[in-house]
């Protein structure tokens, strides 16, 4: 939403200084502050408990760090908006931001958005390659490729979106793109949702395939190491599926709600429309849930791995016990015959 002139309407000025909008800023900042504490616990969990495969673990660290940077950019944008509303709230010609004032925050905000989605794609291919245990996949080589992919690709996408942008317009918040780039920006967002939706479905296909494969190994393979690796892959794939599902759910829900609100904007006053749309920050919620998922899945995997190891050990003891009984029965039979 870009406004061509420096001075906005009285309705938008009242909206930007309304208690509804201020409550929105406080809510988002509260989400960010809570996420900081959760992120600290999630990093400790990942660092101390080496329960994920090395490449998956590296990608999860990159996702957490990106989430922190994204929240910093959002916090900066929101705090600047609150400050502008408090200081220039009575002047409708000073309350807006010129797009050129938002270059750092907005580009950081868009970069972390794209990085997060590309990280989900990297996690998907990480789990896909892990299906074949005979490959030399478990090396640092692949994690470097994934990190380069999700770190460099956003620069090319952002260049295509903004290379011909004009930053002379005015916006209510620095999270809004310039008007000259808004069409390409929305096209990229729409394409991103379709791509993530596709990988969302494919990730569950991998999970169910992994589950079927793991069940087959249980019944046909008696090597403890093979069975353990198969079970470890299954647990890691399930965690990745949940992370991808959470991001796509948050993004699709907020994007769909924004589209619905925009479709009825003629019948909704700006005092309700703009604050409602400001709540629709899908990646903020997704990055809030990410450390929660990592903490929960880490604890769950630790418990399930412990139970699985215990079960395998019991099975080995059970088999050893009956093997010894069979041996003693055969020896006693020989003694009796002699």
Swiss-Prot record:
Keywords, alphabetical: Membrane, Transmembrane, Transmembrane helix
Family, as annotated: Belongs to the nematode receptor-like protein sra family.
Any Gene Ontology CC annotation: membrane
Entry keyword Transmembrane: yes
Protein name: Serpentine receptor class alpha-31
Protein's cellular compartments: Membrane
Species of origin: Caenorhabditis elegans
Membrane topology annotation: Multi-pass membrane protein
Any one GO molecular function term: G protein-coupled receptor activity
Entry's Gene Ontology BP terms: sensory perception of chemical stimulus
Pfam families reported in the protein's UniProt record: 7TM_GPCR_Sra
TM regions (residue ranges): 23-43, 59-79, 108-125, 142-162, 188-208, 240-260, 276-296
Top-level taxon: Eukaryota
């Amino acid at each position: 939403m870009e406004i061509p002139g420096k001075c906005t309407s009285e309705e938008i000025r009242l909206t930007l200084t309304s208690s509804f909008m201020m409550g929105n800023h406080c809510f988002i900042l509260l989400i960010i502050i809570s996420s900081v504490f959760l992120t600290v616990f999630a990093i400790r969990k990942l660092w101390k408990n080496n329960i994920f495969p090395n490449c998956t673990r590296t990608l999860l660290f990159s996702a957490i760090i990106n989430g922190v940077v994204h929240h910093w950019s959002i916090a900066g944008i929101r705090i600047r908006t609150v400050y502008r509303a408090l200081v220039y709230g009575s002047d409708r010609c000073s309350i807006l931001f010129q797009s050129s004032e938002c270059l750092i925050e907005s580009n950081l905000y868009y970069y972390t958005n794209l990085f997060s989605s590309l990280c989900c794609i990297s996690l998907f291919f990480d789990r896909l390659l892990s299906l074949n245990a005979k490959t030399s996949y478990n090396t640092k080589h692949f994690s470097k490729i994934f990190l380069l992919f999700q770190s460099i690709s956003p620069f090319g996408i952002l260049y295509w979106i903004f290379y011909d942008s004009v930053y002379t317009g005015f916006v209510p918040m620095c999270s809004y793109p310039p008007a000259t780039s808004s069409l390409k920006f929305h096209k990229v967002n729409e394409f991103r949702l379709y791509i993530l939706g596709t990988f969302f479905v494919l990730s569950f296909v991998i999970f169910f395939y992994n589950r079927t494969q793991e069940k087959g190994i249980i019944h046909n393979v008696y090597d403890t190491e093979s069975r353990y690796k198969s079970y470890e892959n299954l647990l890691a794939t399930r965690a990745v599926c949940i992370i991808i599902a959470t991001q796509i759910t948050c993004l699709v829900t907020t994007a769909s709600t924004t589209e619905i609100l925009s479709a009825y904007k003629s019948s909704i006053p700006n005092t309700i429309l703009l604050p409602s749309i400001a709540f629709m920050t899908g990646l903020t919620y997704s990055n809030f849930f990410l450390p929660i998922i990592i903490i929960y899945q880490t604890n769950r995997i630790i418990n399930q791995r412990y139970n699985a190891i215990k079960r395998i050990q019991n099975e080995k003891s059970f088999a050893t016990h009956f093997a010894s009984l069979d041996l003693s029965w055969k020896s006693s039979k020989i003694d009796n015959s002699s």
